[in-house]
Amino acid sequence: MTDQFDKTEKQYIELTSGIQRFEHFSVYTDPFLPQIFSHNFVQLHRTFPLDKLLPFFSSVPGMLQANYIHVKAAPEHAFPLLLKQNLVKQGCVVEDELFFARKLENRDLQAGHPLTAWGTEKSLADGSSIMNIYDALYIGEAAAEQKLERKYPLYKDGTVMLVVCYSDASQTIPIGCGELFINKADKTAKIEEVAILDQFQRKGYGSILMNELMAAAKLNGMETVYLVTSGMDGVNRFYEKLGFKRFRRVHTIFHYFLT
């Protein structure tokens, strides 16, 4: 990992996950949140031979100490069609993580939108609350509470900024939030965990929240901001409208075992 995005991504992941490095891959695990897949995975190095991938899978659950396989290919890896077909036949889900980035020279990025807040006790409480509510809908209440307990110290000490979006300027009802992680050395920020409650989506709140996240990054001296998303066309078009451009595609493989 040599460029600014790799460095920032590594720093962000290691806030919650420990790492074991091997010759052709690294293992990231979070013993406090083994059920959160983004905290637990095997990252292949570019030197990993793809013809060894299928036999390698049998050892992954043991490495992760989990009942699932979660493997991320190196950016340099391009899976042949036959490999993808064989993975699917074995019950694996093969998806792409897409990396988007944009520069922050835009003079229109001004922090302080009346529907957003960050850096205060109230915004910390509101952001934590809405993050917990959103996560509970998708990963369950118990996992959501454990995740918040794990990440709350990072929010409280400012290691990760929590930007909140409200339904109106009274800032009474929080409806969404997003994380901002800053890599000061490389002047690069990562936007993560962007969430707007379903009933408030497609009403402009997502753009307001994203613009505030970018403005906050710019205010903190960042020159570039990036995020990682899935291959969903609608989501990708949303980020492209905000000035982001895709610069990387990474294959991910997942297989969950019921027993």
What do these predicted ranges mean?
Residues 1-9, 44, 98-99, 106-147, ...:
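Short amphipathic alpha-helix that is part of the acyltransferase structural core
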Residues 13-20, 65-67, 78-79, 95-96, ...:
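A short helix-loop-beta-strand connector motif used in the catalytic cores of GNAT acetyltransferases and
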Residues 50-122, 253-255:
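Acyl-donor-binding surface of acyltransferase catalytic domains
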Residues 72-79, 226-236, 252-259:
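Conserved beta-strand-loop-alpha-helix junction that forms the acyl-donor binding cleft
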Residues 78-93, 207, 231-249:
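Conserved active-site alpha-helix within GNAT-family acetyltransferase domains
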Residues 149-195:
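A conserved beta-strand-loop-helix scaffold within acyl/acetyltransferase catalytic domains
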